Amino acid sequence: MAVDFAMNGMMHRAFLRELDRVQGFVESGDTPAARRHYGFFSDLLHQHHEGEDTFLFALVRERSTDPDALATIDALEAEHEQLHAALDTCDDDFSGSGPLPADTVADLKALRMVLAAHCAHEEADGE
């Protein structure tokens, strides 16, 4: 069963673009803007993955008999776990109201690397 992931591709590009903006705000020292944009990004990414996990992936599992499609869903779900670990680290960085931790940019870069790889995989093999 083919699933149209075109909307996911647009969302993925928006997530990566917003994450780059957050990093730019952190690097320029604009902590209030970084916190605002990161909060928006994090909330949307959590909702996006919850929707995929709860509805899209469950639907594919329910309707597909293709072992390759099911293996792809298994891999994408495992990637979501990796993403959530990196996202949780960044969520911790942006919690509170004081200065951002010194390793915030490194944490954002690590999150972006995992997110970009996941997005590429989902777009390449998710259809």
Language-model regions: role of each:
Residues M1-E127:
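Small-residue-biased structural context
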